[in-house]
Amino acid sequence: MERITVTLGERSYPITIAAGLFNDPASFMPLKAGEQVMLVTNQTLAPLYLDHVRKVLEQAGVMVDQVILPDGEQYKSLAVLEQVFSALLEKPHGRDTTLIALGGGVIGDLTGFAAACYQRGVRFIQVPTTLLSQVDSSVGGKTAVNHPLGKNMIGAFYQPVSVVVDLDCLKTLPARELSSGLAEVIKYGIILDHDFFVWLENNIDALVALDMQALAYCIRRCCELKAEVVAADERESGLRALLNLGHTYGHAIEAEMGYGVWLHGEAIAAGMVMAAETAHRLGQFSREDIERIKALLLRAGLPVCGPQEMAPGTYLPHMMRDKKVLAGELRLVLPTAIGQAEVRGGVGHDMVLASIAACFPDGMSK
């Protein structure tokens, strides 16, 4: 068992990583007998895990209610959020309740935002079931729902009281979802840790093959990096913005194509190549390192090009709604070397468009 602490003073919390955690009620600390829980999951995961987790909690004396939501990025919406609020109010649940987010990034983000809002804030526990949520979205307190005009535009910074990462969940994860999570894994190597990027180059095939020893190390390292960044910059005023590598471009893909058509990690993978291409055109990132990134993404089963049906000009309106835009100026996270990145403003729209165009299936720069 691995345990990592996200250090935020009195709001610090543990990330527990191991196989078989769902079998032990102690995994769901700080829950105690007699406390009330609302377990939030989706229609895909409910048949796999809901009854088991509920039984373990009830055997420990926890009073459990549940709400089962539709599955998919397109349901990370205000309308679906209202279903959670209605379930809480109908029981009813008070300020002493705890929400448990049993699912991937959509369930985690939506449940966390519900916890932040319900009666002005109740406890919640993240129980991520996808690789993407285990290495990224469950840690750090970013909670949100989408709006038709932009991803994660309605949300709050609100930290969980714990994160429970049961490695056994990955055994039921579809291959496409595993690859989507690997995009965020690769991101950490590009922006923060050259040695980890090299480790990924040597071990990506083992990760794709669901080698549990490799996955355990990979998840632990990503959580360590994320915890360090969040402890230093919880509300994304500086360092934490680097975690958005590829997201300004990738969120444009998700919004334009329709949420869920491209998985989040797929869009971020293409976005990271676009960011690297932009950095190269600015003279701060080598062509050799772009090729290393592309090769690793391809081995992970990820795209390195944007959607063919999205013309470069369709990206910019979405990118200008990005949360990093200040005073109308586009600010991009760009790599400067493998293991290093920066937030850079003042990049001309023509250069951004040219970089996107270079990442079309028939237009990749040689």
UniProtKB/Swiss-Prot annotation:
Its EC number is 4.2.3.4. Pathway: Metabolic intermediate biosynthesis; chorismate biosynthesis; chorismate from D-erythrose 4-phosphate and phosphoenolpyruvate: step 2/7. One of its GO terms (cellular component) is cytoplasm. One of its GO terms (molecular function) is nucleotide binding. It is found in: Cytoplasm. Its cofactor is Co(2+); Zn(2+); NAD(+). One of its GO terms (biological process) is amino acid biosynthetic process. It catalyses: 7-phospho-2-dehydro-3-deoxy-D-arabino-heptonate = 3-dehydroquinate + phosphate. Zn(2+) binds at residues 184, 247, 264. This is 3-dehydroquinate synthase. It comes from Serratia proteamaculans (strain 568). The gene is aroB.
